[in-house]
């Protein structure tokens, strides 16, 4: 099945280098699309990740990370899953370690790291007896001005997108670090893509930025209109198919053939001057 929502990492003039890095670091990694100097798409164990060249004003931060699910069933057993987790811990931690590799109440082996391009990754050994999940899940952390909004936001997204439903939902209880009832962890699908969210268990002074955005691939103008109406909440942020929702998450609502459209200079110039993309004007 085609991946209809794709995370996009804003790179400081390093998209080509980042694409080669991810293709090399992961055992099943490859560059599947590339416009040198502008953007690239990599496949990581079948999951697509987009890389966009830009400046340094919107670096990724941990508000949107990717969970790497080391389910022993995906890797031929627990020993193999642990070995691959440890391998990626070494290779993906070039930008620093947010949570040290070790045992935690929610996982026997876990770490949260930042790679040298600023993207953060949560490496987690999971229980093979649990509900199956894919290897990669984009994860939203609601902190700062967005604290305690995880449930509200995910409910709204699930209501908006097709092929969407909630999976697990675990809340903070008495004696925990956050208010009772706020979201400790939840996962859900949007257009068939598994994602996760949580209310931050500690104070952070960062929140969502365009450093990591979500690309929504649309088949026609009707889909563009529907998702744009449901997502865009900051008029001044509307540009070239980009919009920002009321929690500050950046979305790119674009036609499925955007690469083809942007290859034509006249069409590209029109798109660059649009907010919401209007196919009837191209």
Model-inferred region functions:
Residues 1-20, 25-35, 100, 122-175, ...:
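N-terminal beta-strand motif that seeds the catalytic metal site of vicinal oxygen chelate
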Residues 4, 39, 63-65, 96, ...:
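Structural motif
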Residues 6, 39, 109-110, 137, ...:
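Conserved beta-strand and immediately adjacent loop positions that scaffold enzyme active sites
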